[in-house]
Amino acid sequence: MDLATIAFAFSLVLLSGLSTSIGGALAVGKREPGPKFMAAALGLSAGVMLYVSFMEILPEALKKLESTLGDEARATWTMMGAFFAGIAIITIIDRLVPEEINPHEPATTEEEARRKRLIKTGMFTAFALAIHNFPEGFATFLSGLEAPEIAIPVAVAIAIHNIPEGIAVAVPLRSATGSRKKAFWWATLSGLAEPLGALIGFALLMPFIGPMTFGISFAVIAGIMVFISLDELLPTAEETGEHHCAIYGLIAGMAVMAVSLALFI
């Protein structure tokens, strides 16, 4: 594995992680993206993730496991176990991080209470997203090492998915502090967990990297991506109230992914 491949994979992770800063910039700007745009963008991201997971990443995982285990049945069971393990990992992370946080210290006025609540919400959201983005960073990095034709659309999908996360961090902080700069930088920092996850994951798994490691990791990655699509992206798209835009985006994401894979392969 040469340095250029490692640098390419890490660059993809860094760019997709830093897209939270786009969300931060939108949140501190004068205009926020409209509901139709957000629904379509989130649907597009979900479509890309779902299509590439089932049509490319899982078959690739099975191929690598078969080459190592030498038995299709064992490879299939191993792939299925790793896929649902990926779902379990991201589910546990999702369950451990509460959706809301209440202030622990009493405030002197209602406005002060609101301000403290918003500050804590924004900072806690940044922390929660950092934990949540950790496995996504490693997933993108590993894809970049082994299969660039998969890694590029995956990185784009994760980047789109990170934009509303940046907005979620920046909006309460901007409202509470009045500082656009602080809101923007907190949103940016929340995305840096992805390159950190890539570095730590690579350091831990580098001695074990081979067909078996890639096969299991790809199946785990597919599980993580499917969960994110079904639990986060599509529900968030639906919350905009633009159901059809979300579905059109979903179909468009699948179509774009199908065409891009056909052109690359």
Curated annotation (Swiss-Prot):
Which keywords are on file for this protein?
A: Cell membrane, Ion transport, Iron, Membrane, Metal-binding, Transmembrane, Transmembrane helix, Transport, Zinc, Zinc transport
- Tell me which residues bind Zn(2+): 136, 161, 165
- Using the chain's own numbering, where are the disulfide bonds? none
- Catalytic activity reported: Zn(2+)(in) = Zn(2+)(out)
Q: Which Pfam families match?
A: Zip
Cellular localisation: Cell membrane
Any one Gene Ontology molecular-function term assigned to this protein's record: metal ion binding
Cellular component annotations (GO), alphabetically ordered: plasma membrane
Transmembrane spans: 6-26, 37-57, 77-97, 122-142, 150-170, 184-204, 208-228, 245-265
In this chain, Fe(2+) is annotated as bound at 133, 136, 162, 165, 194
The record's principal subcellular location, in a coarse class, is membrane
Query: How is this protein positioned relative to the membrane?
Result: Multi-pass membrane protein
Sorted alphabetically, which NCBIfam families does this protein's record hold? PRK04201.1
Give the record's family classification: Belongs to the ZIP transporter (TC 2.A.5) family. ZupT subfamily.
Q: Which HAMAP family match?
A: ZupT
What the entry lists under PANTHER family is as follows: ZINC TRANSPORTER ZUPT (PTHR11040:SF205), ZINC/IRON TRANSPORTER (PTHR11040)
Functionally, this protein is described as follows: Mediates zinc uptake. May also transport other divalent cations.
Q: What is this protein called?
A: Zinc transporter ZupT
